[in-house]
């Protein structure tokens, strides 16, 4: 579960390495985010030659979470880290590459471009 002030790894090549969650989008009392949810983030650590800079505020979609994801088939899935991909307003990634596996739930939520760029979909 991702909430306010959670630190996330960035799984793309925008230059950001770590971001902090400012807001979980989707309602006034929404507290937690999981795979496929959009959050507003602030860049905490970044490479000097990247697309985004430290302190920049942008939107991101969650692609991996440590907490178990239970599917309708009864299977559960969890990852080793909490990670996100920085996106534009039209739900397309700002970077051109995705690092590491992503969850299949992203395809159902309309992030097919991220799924197609990912090296592995679980």
Curated annotation (Swiss-Prot):
One of its GO terms (biological process) is translation. The keyword Ribonucleoprotein applies. SMART domains: Ribosomal_L14. PROSITE patterns: RIBOSOMAL_L14. Disulfide bonds: none annotated. Keywords: Ribonucleoprotein, Ribosomal protein, RNA-binding, rRNA-binding. It holds the Pfam family Ribosomal_L14. GO terms for molecular function: large ribosomal subunit rRNA binding; structural constituent of ribosome. InterPro entries: Ribosomal_uL14 (IPR000218), Ribosomal_uL14_bac-type (IPR005745), Ribosomal_uL14_CS (IPR019972), Ribosomal_uL14_sf (IPR036853). The keyword Disulfide bond does not apply. It comes from the Bacteria. One of its GO terms (cellular component) is cytosolic large ribosomal subunit. PANTHER family: 50S/60S RIBOSOMAL PROTEIN L14/L23, LARGE RIBOSOMAL SUBUNIT PROTEIN UL14M. Part of the 50S ribosomal subunit. Forms a cluster with proteins L3 and L19. In the 70S ribosome, L14 and L19 interact and together make contacts with the 16S rRNA in bridges B5 and B8. Binds to 23S rRNA. Forms part of two intersubunit bridges in the 70S ribosome. Belongs to the universal ribosomal protein uL14 family. This is Large ribosomal subunit protein uL14. It comes from Malacoplasma penetrans (strain HF-2) (Mycoplasma penetrans). The gene is rplN.
